[in-house]
Amino acid sequence: MSRSSKKGPYVDVRLLGRIEELNRANEKRVLRTWSRDSTIFPQMVGHTIAVHDGRRHVPVYITENMVGHKLGEFAPTRLFRGHGGKKVDKRGKMK
């Protein structure tokens, strides 16, 4: 279920403040954040934000197409290694 429209989009106040500070200084650097639930605002376009995936920080370069999405959508938390099946050795032969 999506957030109520009367509340408006959520963004971490500290993260938005750091982005605006970088915009004023006309500076680009990687910002680390644990706030996966923050909505991407137009002020963030052009910045690289390292989003925590539970294990490490994944660098995400923000583009115009990402505005309105959540930061966590671009840093997957699970690694899919494929379904079980027949084992294949390094030379491509079945065991």
From Swiss-Prot:
Give yes or no: UniProt keyword ATP-binding. no
Per the record, its GO cellular-component terms are: cytoplasm; small ribosomal subunit
Encoding gene per record: rpsS
Sorted alphabetically, which Gene3D superfamilies does this protein's record hold?
Answer: 30s Ribosomal Protein S19, Chain A
The protein's name: Small ribosomal subunit protein uS19
Belongs to which family? Belongs to the universal ribosomal protein uS19 family.
Q: What keywords are annotated for this sequence in UniProt?
A: Ribonucleoprotein, Ribosomal protein, RNA-binding, rRNA-binding
Its biological purpose is as follows: Protein S19 forms a complex with S13 that binds strongly to the 16S ribosomal RNA.
Pfam families of this UniProt entry?
Ribosomal_S19
Q: Is RNA-binding among the key words of this record?
A: yes
An MF annotation (GO) of this entry: structural constituent of ribosome
The upper taxonomy is: Bacteria, Bacillati, Chloroflexota, Chloroflexia, Chloroflexales
One biological process term in Gene Ontology = ribosomal small subunit assembly
Q: Which organism is it from?
A: Roseiflexus castenholzii (strain DSM 13941 / HLO8)
InterPro entries recorded for this chain?
A: Ribosomal_uS19, Ribosomal_uS19_bac-type, Ribosomal_uS19_CS, Ribosomal_uS19_SF
Domain of life from the UniProt record = Bacteria
